[in-house]
Each structure stands twice: as structure tokens, then as C-alpha cells.
Amino acid sequence: MRIAFASEDKLGLEGQVSMHFGRCPFYTFLEVENGVVKNWQVMENPYFGNHVPGKVPEFIHSQKADVMIAGGMGPRAIEFFDGYGIEAVTGAFGKIKDVLQAYLRGELRGAGACHHDHPESCRHE
């Protein structure tokens, strides 16, 4: 299984999950087999600072992810991921390695679109 994480940094498993999936600077991709991380890779968000709706889900799909985990994402992004057959998971925070374990234990499932008031700094897909 290939799991993508919205990331604040390039620290891999020690990195922090980003609260805003489409506007994070990096994505961390993990190859997980039988609950064990076999490989990981950090890639820059090619649309960081140049938001185009639907392009980030397309990028994540092109990287062959099965799951996308982030702190939050908007309903349109969730629809794009659904269309690609990628499980969108929200509500994640903290270190990627800890969030991965929570996901594998079944503590994080499905996506809930963000419905809080959006100040200028909080914009979702």
C-alpha cells in the first residue's frame, strides 16, 4: 500500500503532518507492507503557491497513492480523490510515524470536509 501524507517538512517519518493538504510544501509517500514501512520518499508540492483545483489530487494519483492523509481538506478535493479511488483521510496531526500507526490501527478513517470558518490563512481545496 502506498500512503501519501501532506507534510510540513522533509523529515520523512519524523516529519509533521500538514493541516492543509493542498497548500502544504511537501508530500511524504510511504510504501507499507504488512504494517511495516519498506520505503519512503519526500516530494515537493508542485503546486505550492500556485493553487489550481484538482491538480494536487491528480499529482497524488500520478504517484500511485492508495491513501491520502492530511489534517484537513475541502469537499471538492475529497470528491477528486474519490474519483481516483484514493481513500482521503482527515483529522491527522503530529508526527507522520505516529499518524501512520493510528491509521494502521483503524483509528483514522474516511474524510470529513472542513466546515469551520475560514480566515485568510485557512483555505482548502
Regions found by a protein language model. Name each.
Residues 1-51, 55, 59-62, 83, ...:
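Non-catalytic interface/targeting segments
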Residues 64-67, 86-87:
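Short active-site oxyanion
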Residues 70-71:
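Short His-Asn-centered micro-motif
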Residues 77-78, 96:
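Short, well-ordered alpha-helical microsegments
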Residues 78-84:
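Short Gly/Thr/Asp-enriched flexible loops that form oxyanion-binding sites at enzyme active sites
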